[in-house]
Amino acid sequence: MMAAGAAVALALWLLLPAVGVGEAGPPPIQDGEFTFLLPAGRKQCFYQSAPANASLETEYQVIGGAGLDVDFTLESPQGVLLVSESRKADGVHTVEPTEAGDYRLCFDNSFSTISEKLVFFELIFDSFQDEEEVEGWAEAVEPEEMLDVKMEDIKESIETMRTRLERSIQMLTLLRAFEARDRNLQEDNLERVNFWSAANVAVLLLVAVLQVCTLKRFFHDKRPVPT
């Protein structure tokens, strides 16, 4: 079962660096998700750059491995410990506002000496749109009094739709993670049921053979027959 989990763990890191166009500046922030295999007795950390005055939401879930638990820590770019959890199956944490720099996320499986863990986590950024960009876009259109529908209403509707679509994508991603965890758990239970069922059948057959042999010994008379 964990071999299948290892195949899932080969998912590509989706937080790809963006290339700026025009004037040099920091790349735009991007949401991302990642699934990886955490070996027994190991600790693995990830670093994610974040701009200042934004919102960072971190969601993680253990979807494979005995116990379905892991230790989790989140540190700020200044090295301040923001979140520390022990032996948790999942968690959701929000940092707001963020500091400019690299945040450190660590998953620790040191307490387990045998079982590896399949871990999924997602990073969700949210920041206010650049006011200059919004004003420049608004100046490029005709005055509001010349339109049947106010531009402010259109912008509000588009922003609401964008937010809902992004949240829908995030919820679907989490549902996929829940489905993967439940499937792995069911496969583990199926293996246990099959193993113990086969063991019970073997014991029943052994008992039946012993009973037959015992009954044969009762009816087998080795005394000589007088002639």
From Swiss-Prot:
Main location: membrane
Family note: Belongs to the EMP24/GP25L family.
Locus of motif COPII vesicle coat-binding: 218-219
Lineage, opening ranks: Eukaryota, Metazoa, Chordata, Craniata, Vertebrata
Name the UniProt record assigns to this protein: Transmembrane emp24 domain-containing protein 1
Segments crossing the lipid bilayer: 195-215
Tissue-by-tissue expression: Widely expressed.
A Pfam family assignment: EMP24_GP25L
Domain GOLD intervals: 43-125
Ranges of the Cytoplasmic topological domain: 216-227
Motif (COPI vesicle coat-binding): 218-227
Gene: Tmed1
Compartment(s) of residence: Cell membrane; Endoplasmic reticulum membrane; Golgi apparatus, cis-Golgi network membrane; Endoplasmic reticulum-Golgi intermediate compartment membrane
